[in-house]
Amino acid sequence: PLFQQKAAPLGKKLWQTEHYVNSDANISTIMPIAKEIHDVMVTGSANAYVYWWIPHANGLTANDGTLFKRAYVIGQFAKHVRPGYFRVEATATPATNVYVSAYAGNGKVVIVAVNSSTAAVSQTFTLQNATVSQFSTWQTSASANMAAGSEASVSGNSFTFSLPAQSIT
């Protein structure tokens, strides 16, 4: 709130940096990171969420270079929400434990849906002021690391998609 009152009117941008979260390959310990990025972008109206990619056991990679699950969670936002994209209005919490943010840029629409529930959720998305016929999906979950998912076909500006338990799509 202080940012919106004092800095935003002056044209200042808000960037949020990560902080250490004790998490590893366990999806349940990673979900708070996805929720935090969602909150920073939606509630905090941040322009960027910065994760310092430093090779270290507490960072995004193990000492052997293997990516930790948290890297894939951050990638769900970073790979698809590119520089120059802007956040567009979306119902931030369309269901209990489901968090949605949407972005547009370069003629594309990106929706990031976080399902922190321990059960899959069938979620309907309705698009306004956009003409889209289908979405490519990418998922990170207990068993997937930014894996290509099924296509979501849009009919009459809406589509329903199953969000796996504890996943980012």
Residue ranges and their predicted role:
Residues 1-2, 22-26, 56-61, 119-121, ...:
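Flexible loop/turn segments at secondary-structure boundaries
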Residues 11-79, 88-96:
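Aromatic/acidic polysaccharide-binding cleft in carbohydrate-active enzymes
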Residues 1, 17-21, 51-55, 113-117, ...:
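Active-site-proximal beta-strand/loop segments in catalytic clefts of secreted hydrolases
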Residues 150-169:
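C-terminal beta-strand-rich structural cap/linker in extracellular carbohydrate-active enzymes
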Residues 40, 74, 111, 137, ...:
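Hydrophobic, well-ordered secondary-structure elements that form the walls
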Residues 127-146:
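Solvent-exposed beta-hairpin/edge-strand motifs
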Residues 93-133, 166:
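Carbohydrate-binding surface patches
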